[in-house]
C-alpha cells in the first residue's frame, strides 16, 4: 500500500491550493489527502483536533505556511501520533513578524481571526520523533513586506530566519516566493527527496 501524505494549506487559502503538490505526490506513488480547515473563523481550537484524527494512521505531512505551524502544534499536543516525516513550506515556526504587525492595525486582528496567536507565537523547539524539514524561500514577492520589516532574506511573507527552529532535521533555502512554493517544480523535487530520504538535496537548491 502506498504511503499516505496529508497536505495542509496556509492562511486565507482553500485546501485546493495544495492540489498541485498533491498531483505530484500521486504521480510519485503516494496517497495524497488534502486537509481543509477554517483559518480565520475556526482557528487551531477546531483545526488541531481534526488534523490529529487524520494522523492516527501512519503518514507523512506536507504543509504550507500556517499549515506547518498547525501540523507541528498537533504533533506536539499528541506525541504518539505515527507521523514519519513533515515537510514545511515557508512556515513561520518562530512566529510571523508580518502577522504581528498586521494584528496591530485597525481591523488587522479580525483579518487574522482565530489563527492570530498561532502565527504570532509559532512553535516550541521540535523534540518529536518525526523528522521535520523546512523549505524556505528568498524571492521577496508578497504583501507581507507591506505589514512587516524583515531582517535578512524573505519570501515576501515570511523571513528565512522565521522558518528556523531547533530540532529540524534539515533546512534549505530556494529561490521562490511564498505563494510560488505552491506551484514550484524545484520545491516539489525537494519535497519528494525529503519524504524518501529524510533530507534535502542541497546540490539541487539552485537548479531549475
Task: Give the residues covered by each predicted segment.
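C-terminal catalytic-base region of ester-bond hydrolases, centering on the histidine
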Residues: 129-208
